Regions:
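Residue-level recognition of single "structural anchor" positions
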Residues: 16-24, 33, 65, 86, ...
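RNase H-like DDE/DDD metal-dependent nuclease/strand-transfer catalytic core used by mobile genetic elements
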Residues: 5-6, 23-47, 53-151
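Residues at helix-coil transition
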Residues: 2, 79, 164-165
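Basic, flexible linker segments flanking DNA-binding modules
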Residues: 1-31, 36, 103, 176-185
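C-terminal, beta-rich DNA-binding module of retroviral/retroelements integrases
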Residues: 160, 164-223
Length: 223
């Protein structure tokens, strides 16, 4: 390390894992797509899951025909349970922007005063709770394959209710998550539009680049 042969990034990979847990409900939600699988009608299912970090309460587990449409799922969750302080996800293209820029989803979260957080690349332990949730889902729910997307929605909804209200959790003193979770006191609201002053107008293309003559500068896809 003294000779510059070991990078800080490489050193960080080998640090001992540190468990974390927020001290109250809705301080952090974890979200991720469960790996897709084949349904009985040969279509593919991409379950999107949202988990409260403190209580392990499953906010949403929603089977989808594609790894997209996350804003609608979160919007329904915000309407039912209120707003979290932050949302932790991996660096998948649905959640994380290109070259450090922001996605439309991240911009929307920030407009709602929600901090988007991303785990370290190739370090799934950061989202250990939702990874463990996915293992439980695979063991208890996906032992039998749903017939189609509608059948998947029914089975996922039933299993989610059992997981939240009946299934005891060791980290909660053998209580089910529903006995610990409380909805957020922050209700969903409509963000105020930005009011920009007068000045030079420059167009940002669909890929987030701003052009000055022959020079291209990357800003963000949300501009």
């Amino acid at each position: 390390k003294r000779n510059g042969c070991i990078s800080p990034e490489e050193s960080q990979k080998h640090q001992p894992y540190q468990c974390f847990e927020r001290d109250r409900c809705n301080a952090l939600w974890q979200t991720d797509f469960k790996g897709d699988f084949l349904l009985g009608d040969s279509s593919r299912c991409f379950p999107l899951d949202i988990l409260d970090d403190r209580s392990r309460f499953c906010i949403r587990t929603e089977p989808k025909p594609a790894a997209s449409g996350i804003k609608e799922t979160f919007l329904n969750a915000f309407r039912e349970y209120g707003l979290p302080d932050s949302v932790l996800s991996d660096n998948g293209s649905q959640f994380s922007g290109f070259r450090g820029g922001y996605t439309q989803f991240e911009r929307w979260l920030m407009d709602l005063d929600i901090l988007p957080i991303h785990g370290r690349i190739r370090h799934p332990q950061t989202q250990g709770k939702i990874e463990r949730f996915h293992r439980t889902m695979k063991l208890e729910l996906l032992r039998t394959v749903p017939n189609d997307m509608e059948d998947a929605r029914v089975k996922f909804a039933l299993w989610r209710w059992k997981y939240n209200h009946i299934r005891p959790h060791a980290a909660l003193g053998m209580k089910p998550p529903a006995q610990v979770y409380e909805p957020s006191s922050r209700a969903l609201f409509v963000p105020k539009p930005y009011d920009y002053g007068s000045g030079m107008v420059r167009k940002v293309n669909n890929w987030g680049y701003l052009r000055f003559g022959p020079v291209r500068v990357y800003l963000s896809e949300t501009m």
